[in-house]
Amino acid sequence: MKIVFSEKCLEYGSWHIEGPERVRRAYEILKEKGYEFLAPGLASEHDVLRVHDADYVRRLKDGLVEDADTPAYENIYEYARLAAGGAILAARVKGFSLMRPPGHHAGRRGLALGVRTRGFCYLNNIAIAVKYLGKPALILDVDGHHGNGTQEIFLGDESVTYVGLHRYPHYPGTGYSSEGNCLNFPLSGDCGDEVYLKTLDEALSKVDLDKFEVVAVSAGFDAHAGDLASLGLTELGFNKIGKKIASLRKHTFFVLEGGYSGENNGKDIDELLKSFEL
C-alpha cells in the first residue's frame, strides 16, 4: 500500500502536542520498511465546500478559527487543504495518508455536536475524500476519540454508514449511543486488544457490507497503550485490526487522525497495513 506524505505538513506547530514529530518519526520508520511514497496536492475549494460551510471556510482562511485545542496558525488553511488533498489522493490510490492536521472532530461549521473545541482539526479530511469519491462508503473510525465531526457531517446520509469505536467517557464526550446511520461502540479505557477486537467484530456484524463500495478508515493511533485515549491496544492489536479490514475486500483507504507518539505511530501503521499489498 502506498503512503501519501509531504514534508510541508511538518512546517508548523512544533510546540503543540499535535506536532510534526508524531508524523516525522512515523515517516522515517515506514521509509525504512520500504513503502512507496506519493506527494499530495491541495484539495480544491470545491472539494472543501462539498463538506464545509462557506462562512466557516472564509473564517478559517482569515485566521479567525481558534480554540483552546486548535490554534490559528499562520497559513493553516493551506496546511489543512494539503491534508485534505492527501486524503483524496489516498482515496484514489487505495493508500494511507500520513498527513496532518487531523480532521475527524471538524464539523460542517467547525465545532460539532455541541463540543466546544475542534480537537486539533480544521477540515474533515476523511469526509472530503469520501465526498470526492462519491460512492457508497463505510467509514470506520478506530481513533481513540469519537469522530463527532464526521458523525455530524454524515448523519442521515443514506450512502454512508459511520462506525466508531472509541473511549468513553472521554473527549469529546459524544458517541455514547448510536443514531441512525452512525453506529457507536463506546469502550472503557485500557480495555485491551481482546475486548477491542470482539467489539470490532460486533460492529462489522451490524453493517450490511453489500451496500458499500468503499471502506474509509479514520486511522488514529491514540488508542495505543499509554497514548491520549488509551484503549490498551498493541502493535499486534493493530495488525489484527488490519486483517479484519482487509478481509472485507473493498476499495479501502486510510487517513491519519490522532496518535501522539511518532515511534508508536510508525510501527502501528506498518502492522495495520501488513494485510494489504505494499
Task: Write out the residue ranges for each language-model feature.
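Short acidic/histidine-rich active-site segments
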Residues: 251-258
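Short, hydrophobic-biased amphipathic alpha-helical segments
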Residues: 22, 83, 241, 265-273
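Metal-dependent catalytic neighborhoods of phosphoester/phosphodiester hydrolases
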Residues: 227-229, 262-267
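Metal-dependent C-N hydrolase catalytic cores
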Residues: 1-130, 134, 186, 204, ...
